[in-house]
C-alpha cells in the first residue's frame, strides 16, 4: 500500500504558500491507518522500548496505537495547564517567542527507553523539546517515529543524534 496516496494535500491551507498534508483521509481508511501503525510497530519492536511518548494532539493518534500494539506505556506530552497534579516542564524557543511542554512527573522512570511518535516531522523543534523533556526526567530516547516528513524544513538536522524513521516524505 502506498501511504502517500492516502494523504490529501491541500494547497493554500491554512494560508497561501502552505501545502497542508491532511491525514484525516488516511485515518478514515481503516486499512491505511492500520498499515501505518503496523509499519511503525515493526520498526520499533526490537528496540527494547519501555514507553512511547507523543505530543498532543495528532501524536496521540499514532502514539497510543503503537504503545498498545507494543504492550508498553503511553506518555502523553501536553501543552501547559492540561495535566493535573505534579508536572515536569521544558521550555523551548520558537521563531517568535517560546513554548512549553509538560508531562506528569511520575510518567518517566529513570532508564526508560522511550520512542517518540508523532504525525509530522517539519522543523523538528517540537520533537526535540519532547526528547529534552524525556531526558531531563531520566529517560533515554531510543527512536523518533513519524508518519510524514517535510524534508526541506530540516527536522532531521536538529535531531541528528537520534534514530529517526518516517513513513512518507514530501519536499515541502
UniProtKB/Swiss-Prot annotation:
Its EC number is 2.4.2.7. One of its GO terms (biological process) is purine ribonucleoside salvage. It is found in: Cytoplasm. The keyword Cytoplasm applies. It holds the Pfam family Pribosyltran. GO terms for cellular component: cytoplasm. Belongs to the purine/pyrimidine phosphoribosyltransferase family. Catalyzes a salvage reaction resulting in the formation of AMP, that is energically less costly than de novo synthesis. Homodimer. This is Adenine phosphoribosyltransferase.
Amino acid at each position: 500500500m502506498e501511504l502517500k496516496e492516502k494523504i490529501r494535500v491541500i494547497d493554500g491551507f491554512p494560508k497561501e504558500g502552505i501545502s497542508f498534508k491532511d491525514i484525516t483521509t488516511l485515518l478514515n481508511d481503516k486499512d491505511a491507518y492500520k498499515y501505518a501503525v503496523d509499519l511503525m510497530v515493526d520498526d520499533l519492536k526490537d528496540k527494547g522500548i519501555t514507553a512511547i511518548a507523543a505530543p498532543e494532539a495528532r501524536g496521540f493518534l499514532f502514539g497510543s496505537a503503537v504503545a498498545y500494539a507494543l504492550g508498553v506505556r503511553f506518555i502523553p506530552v501536553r501543552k501547559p495547564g492540561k495535566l493535573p497534579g505534579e508536572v515536569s516542564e521544558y521550555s523551548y524557543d520558537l521563531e517568535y517567542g517560546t513554548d512549553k511542554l509538560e508531562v506528569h512527573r511520575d510518567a518517566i522512570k529513570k532508564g526508560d527507553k522511550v520512542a517518540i511518535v508523532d504525525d509530522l516531522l517539519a522543523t523538528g523543534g517540537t520533537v526535540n523539546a519532547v526528547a529534552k523533556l524525556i531526558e531531563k526526567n531520566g529517560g533515554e530516547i531510543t527512536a523518533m517515529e513519524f508518519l510524514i516528513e517535510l524534508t526541506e524544513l530540516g527536522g532531521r538536522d536538529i535531531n541528528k543524534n537520534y534514530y529517526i524513521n518516517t513513513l512518507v516524505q514530501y519536499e515541502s
